[in-house]
Amino acid sequence: MSATSILIAAAESGHSDENVLIPPLSELLIGTLSFALLVAFFFWKIRPQIARTYAQRTERIEGGLARAEAAQREAQALLEQYRAQLAEARTEAARIREEAHSEGRQITEELRAAAQREIAEIKARADAQLAADRAQIVAQVRREVGEIAVDLASKIVGFQLESSATQNRLIDDFIAALDNSAEGVGTVAAPVRPGG
């Protein structure tokens, strides 16, 4: 049977003076007392456990938030430290790079100066060698020219210059005359006669 059929059957049974919606007083007292006992039991046993669980969960959440904030602060501090180290490393790298450039320029200048000194030394040695070679060639040419001049003078004058001192003096005078004419003096010394 359904609830509707039960209500209809109760209405037909003849209890028309009672109100169905208002319970009897004994049931009302038992229901109220049961509800009061249930509420008292709730406040005495269940509410402290719920409050304790709620406090623990709140504490756990707040602790988790505090730990998360602490971890975030620590991560931020590590990030700042990393950024500072990175900036320091960049500054150090720039300083090292500048020192390397400076040392490179200094080494280049030193090598350039050493090369210039070496070039100057080589040039000085070459100039000295050229001067020595020139002096040797000039002396050799003078000697050969003197010998040719003595031979020529002997043939022109018709007699042999026998004295080597006379030959040497004649050669020296002739070369001096050639030097003077080369310098633009224009005077040629008179040839030395044999015997004076």
Curated annotation (Swiss-Prot):
GO cellular component: plasma membrane; proton-transporting ATP synthase complex
Keyword RNA-binding: no
Cell compartments where the protein resides: Cell membrane
SUPFAM superfamilies: F1F0 ATP synthase subunit B, membrane domain
Membrane topology, from the record: Single-pass membrane protein
Highest taxon, organism lineage: Bacteria
Gene3D superfamilies: F1F0 ATP synthase subunit B, membrane domain
Name of protein: ATP synthase subunit b
Species assigned in the record: Frankia casuarinae (strain DSM 45818 / CECT 9043 / HFP020203 / CcI3)
